[in-house]
Amino acid sequence: MPELPEVEVVRRGLHHHLVGKTIASTLVYHERAVRRQSGGAVELAGLLAGQQISGTGRRGKYLWLTLEGSSGAQALVVHLGMSGQMLIGPISRPQHLRIAATLDDGSVLSFVDQRTFGGWMVTDLVTVDGSELPEPVAHIARDPLDELFEIGAVVTRLRGKHTEIKRALLDQTVVSGVGNIYADEALWQARVHGRRLTDGMSRAKLTEVLDSAAAVMRLALAQGGTSFDDLYVNVNGESGYFDRSLEAYGREGEPCRRCGRAMRREAFMNRSSYFCPSCQRLVEPR
């Protein structure tokens, strides 16, 4: 699933291509892509018609287009799911086209989604913590790249929880945007085992983990995100290349680039965690 860097790459591309343009018409080719819209395809198309795209936003892994029309400020919320793509111009996989919106200049915004876990929904904006957010996103916490992210408050909350640090990093109500890949990368950078309990960690170490998450995601963002296959691409259909720079994720059996020990993998919440058994010991050495 695309994580913060990948979604932010898409948001930036959409902002560049779409802001100031008006949606002329929308065609829905697969009902699952609009399952979150109460009135389905007809309602979505009606709500989008004539709306001008005035901006873009992102909170964690959710992104949206801000709309200005006769109904006032609304948002087109996009969830990419496991394989969703927002593409401008010609598409290479028309068999996976789920939604197409034609703009007033004749260009087309396509939502392509092979696995159909993602989708579009038009919703109202609400004010939360001084920020205007789509209603379905209102419960999502700020992410480490948000300029208003309060790291001290997040550390306090983490220390008040009796939970594993990796589990906490994946809790989108505590800190958003961090998924399995970047959690493993941040924990490797901070030399912390993912099963360490947050209430037993110092404020300094928790701060280091969150700082590492932010640093890793900035690096990934600069490289266009992480693409293991062609399911994640930017709005021009191009893949990111941060997978070449991963230090932990997917490196089972390979030498740790810090100490040389073989990296390990263990099961975690129906996924996998990758870590160095030497640099990331579960029990601190005496």
From Swiss-Prot:
Q: What reaction(s) does this enzyme catalyze?
A: Hydrolysis of DNA containing ring-opened 7-methylguanine residues, releasing 2,6-diamino-4-hydroxy-5-(N-methyl)formamidopyrimidine; 2'-deoxyribonucleotide-(2'-deoxyribose 5'-phosphate)-2'-deoxyribonucleotide-DNA = a 3'-end 2'-deoxyribonucleotide-(2,3-dehydro-2,3-deoxyribose 5'-phosphate)-DNA + a 5'-end 5'-phospho-2'-deoxyribonucleoside-DNA + H(+)
* Keywords, ordered alphabetically: DNA damage, DNA repair, DNA-binding, Glycosidase, Hydrolase, Lyase, Metal-binding, Multifunctional enzyme, Zinc, Zinc-finger
Q: FPG-type zinc fingers: which residues? A: 247-281
Q: Does the keyword DNA repair apply?
A: yes
Q: Which SUPFAM superfamilies match?
A: Glucocorticoid receptor-like (DNA-binding domain), N-terminal domain of MutM-like DNA repair proteins, S13-like H2TH domain
How are cofactors bound according to the entry's free-text note?
Answer: Binds 1 zinc ion per subunit.
What cofactor requirement does the entry state? Zn(2+)
Among the record's GO biological process terms, what is one?
base-excision repair
* Subunit and interaction comment: Monomer.
**Its function?**
Involved in base excision repair of DNA damaged by oxidation or by mutagenic agents. Acts as a DNA glycosylase that recognizes and removes damaged bases. Has a preference for oxidized purines, such as 7,8-dihydro-8-oxoguanine (8-oxoG). Has AP (apurinic/apyrimidinic) lyase activity and introduces nicks in the DNA strand. Cleaves the DNA backbone by beta-delta elimination to generate a single-strand break at the site of the removed base with both 3'- and 5'-phosphates.
Q: Which family does it belong to?
A: Belongs to the FPG family.
Report the HAMAP family cross-referenced here.
Fapy_DNA_glycosyl
Q: What is this protein called?
A: Formamidopyrimidine-DNA glycosylase
The gene it comes from is mutM
